[in-house]
C-alpha cells in the first residue's frame, strides 16, 4: 500500500528560472530532466532529500494563469499492481499502471473533488535512484 509522498508537481512558466530558484536559491539538487524525442527538455526533478522530490513541468503562460500551478500529489506505493487491484476492489477508479519515462511505475486516481493523485512505484532502474 502507500509508503510515503514521492513528489509534488508544479507547472511553471519558465523552467530555467524555476530550476535556478530551486537549485541556486534554495540549495536543492537538480537530479534529472524529462526530454522529448528531439532532446528538448520539458520538465525535471529536484531532490528535496532522500526519495522526496519536486517535479517541474513547463507550461504556457495562459495555462498557468488560467489554472493553479499545482498539478498533483504523488503517493509512493510498494507494489503498483497489488495497490491498483486493492483500490479497484474498494470502488476506486484507477488507471492501468504504466512505466513512465523515469523508469518508475505510475497509475492515477482522483479524489471526490477531481484532484489528481499519482500512485508511484520505484524500480531498480528509476532515475530517482541515481541522484
Task: Annotate each predicted stretch with a short phrase.
Residues 66, 73-84:
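Mid-chain, well-packed structural core segment of small domains
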Residues 9-51:
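Core segments of cupin and vicinal oxygen chelate
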Residues 36-38, 63-64, 99-101:
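A short beta-turn/loop motif at secondary-structure boundaries
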Residues 1, 84-131:
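Vicinal oxygen chelate
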Residues 1-17, 70-73, 125-131:
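N-terminal beta-strand motif that seeds the catalytic metal site of vicinal oxygen chelate
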Amino acid at each position: 500500500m502507500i509508503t510515503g509522498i514521492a513528489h509534488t508537481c508544479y507547472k511553471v512558466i519558465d523552467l530555467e528560472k524555476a530550476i535556478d530558484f530551486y537549485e541556486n536559491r534554495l540549495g536543492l539538487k537538480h537530479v534529472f530532466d524529462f526530454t522529448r524525442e528531439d532532446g528538448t527538455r520539458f520538465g525535471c526533478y529536484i531532490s528535496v532529500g532522500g526519495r522526496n522530490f519536486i517535479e517541474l513541468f513547463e507550461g504556457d503562460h495562459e495555462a498557468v494563469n488560467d489554472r493553479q500551478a499545482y498539478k498533483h500529489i504523488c503517493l509512493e506505493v510498494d507494489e503498483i499492481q497489488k495497490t491498483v487491484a486493492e483500490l479497484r476492489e474498494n470502488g476506486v477508479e484507477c488507471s492501468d499502471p504504466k512505466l513512465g519515462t523515469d523508469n518508475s511505475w505510475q497509475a492515477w486516481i482522483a479524489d471526490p473533488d477531481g484532484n489528481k493523485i499519482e500512485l508511484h512505484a520505484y524500480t531498480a532502474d528509476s532515475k530517482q535512484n541515481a541522484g
